[in-house]
Amino acid sequence: MRVQDEAASATAGPNKNVLISGASFAGLATAYWMNRLGYDVTVVEIREGLNRGGTPVNIGDDAAGIVKRMGLFEQIQANRLPMKSGELVNADDTAAGPLQFPQDTAVPEIDWEIERDTLLDLMFDAVKNDATFVFANSIEALDETENDIGVTFKDGSQRSFALVFGCDGVHSRVRKLRFGDEKQYTHFLGQYFSITIVDELLIKEGTTQIYNEPGKFVMLNAYNNKTDIVLCFASEHEIPYDYRDEAQQRKIISEQFAGQGWRIPELLDKVEMSTSFYFDKVCQIKMPAWTKGRVALVGDAGYCASPAAGMGGSLAIIGAAALADAFHKHRGNVELAFQDYNESFHPYTETVQAGAANNLDVLIPKSEDGVHRGSAHP
């Protein structure tokens, strides 16, 4: 079902003000659709601007259908990255074999990549004139009443909204305030990873290289005169760390990969010198419901599938459309729309999350024998 402009009068009640926390893919997509449904949209983002940086975003068949509805398909097509070739490499930097996939893997009709910042800009441009954006601020408290939900912001200001959407990522503040502590919903998958992007080509442009050791995974992805360095390691137990302490995270990566083979010493130097660094545990967010009262979660905040799914940005875009379709279907009845969103979209997210968990078993082999078998089917 498609959200249509004429649905606006039917969906927007007396209080048409909605607040979206987070201005990345989930937030921008939700802002787009809620505006189309006739709501007055405010987006609050803790950063001083859009959250730039990060690896390219995959646009597959399902996401392609959504961006067509948003009028972004042609622009994404025009900005897609060239198809890459990939190979597994040995410790001596010789090729171990091409990247292959199991024979039963479905081949999508559309399988594009686009730079994250490019897609972010396209989505922001699509909604920037139809929503109010408040940067360098965040939600500090929520106070729901029968008629609305009061929001206290970090700067001390207060305002009431009809609905609040948490589109603020795996460490969602909205989820913590409304649904409880993160630990209830985080499922650790036994790995940690870092992403660093350097403005130079460490391998041939348009190629990907993967190197494995037992319990270790390294990927180089080269495009547009830059290279993504992805370092991932297995851990049976969770490592205590502060997700806001970058120095601590850099130390963890350095210690985990010290003394490893291939080009890892060189790559660690690149990571150390770079200002681009992201680290987190590989986890999934699993919740029985993504809605509570006047609050709903979209994207990683509600159903993060982990980077192993290869569709974090896409899943957020698809999820925002699923929520909007539920609003349109039920003509703005929030209770029914939220129920529909939970019931209809849960099976999809569960399938994506299961696939991501299976991918990790192949990407990060636990034994030397697993490394060799992974050379055949990464």
What spans do the regions from the language model cover?
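Conserved N-terminal glycine-rich FAD pyrophosphate-binding loop of Rossmann-like flavoproteins
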Residues: 49-65
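A structural signal for isolated positions on well-ordered beta-strands in alpha/beta enzyme cores
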Residues: 19, 42, 132, 228-230
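Short helix-loop capping/hinge motifs at secondary-structure junctions, enriched
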Residues: 200-206, 238, 263, 288
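A short coil-to-beta-strand element that immediately follows conserved catalytic motifs
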Residues: 186-190, 205-207, 262-279
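Conserved mid-domain beta->alpha element of the FAD-binding
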Residues: 19-36, 40-48, 165-166, 194, ...
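Acidic/histidine metal-binding catalytic segments
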Residues: 79, 132, 259-275, 334-339, ...
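Active-site substrate-recognition segment that forms the wall
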Residues: 196, 207-239, 257-259
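Conserved N-terminal helical subregion
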Residues: 2-18, 35-37, 60-197, 236-254, ...
